[in-house]
Amino acid sequence: MAESQTGGGGGGSHESGGDQSPRSLNVREQDRFLPIANISRIMKRGLPLNGKIAKDAKETMQECVSEFISFVTSEASDKCQREKRKTINGDDLLWAMATLGFEDYIDPLKVYLMRYREMEGDTKGSGKGGESSAKRDGQPSQVSQFSQVPQQGSFSQGPYGNSQGSNMMVQMPGTE
């Protein structure tokens, strides 16, 4: 994983075959990838307690996840540039995922984004803050630590990654 990328992947526009922008030329590996400890922790959630993950599997997943994030973010960034905006928001990412063919993930992510904004007090999606309607009405928001989201695609739920449940639990940010 220490070798540098010199071809089709680098986090740029997926149509250009790579990112040739000045900011991508001197990117360190630690800045390009999510921390391996985080990747490993997420991967272990789908294994039995005595399950092991090979180092190369963790590194491969680390690279794939980082490339996926760059792919979706690049599409959202292109949209924002066309609209002459500088900030990518959650709605832009959902649009990018739909555009790139990841429709099965849109509905659960919309629910997650809505509940996240409720917790953050942002109902407009602008990222500028503000109060949710429940707070304005003097009522506390009824967002639980875990939100049930309808299952989409082939996402597995069970502790061993093989159950066929119809819902998945999503931990909301800030409730750990």
UniProtKB/Swiss-Prot annotation:
Biased composition (Polar residues): 160-169
Main location class: nucleus
Annotated positions of the N-acetylalanine modification: 2
DNA-binding region: 34-40
One BP term from GO: glucosinolate metabolic process
Keywords noted in UniProt: Acetylation, Activator, DNA-binding, Nucleus, Transcription, Transcription regulation
Tissue specificity statement from the Swiss-Prot or TrEMBL entry: Expressed in the whole plant, except roots.
Keyword DNA-binding assigned: yes
Biased composition regions of type Low complexity, renumbered to the chain: 139-159
Gene Ontology CC terms: CCAAT-binding factor complex
GO molecular function: DNA-binding transcription activator activity, RNA polymerase II-specific; DNA-binding transcription factor activity; protein heterodimerization activity; transcription cis-regulatory region binding
Subcellular location: Nucleus
Family: Belongs to the NFYB/HAP3 subunit family.
Quaternary structure, from the entry: Heterotrimeric transcription factor composed of three components, NF-YA, NF-YB and NF-YC. NF-YB and NF-YC must interact and dimerize for NF-YA association and DNA binding.
Its job: Component of the NF-Y/HAP transcription factor complex. The NF-Y complex stimulates the transcription of various genes by recognizing and binding to a CCAAT motif in promoters.
Listed name of the protein: Nuclear transcription factor Y subunit B-10
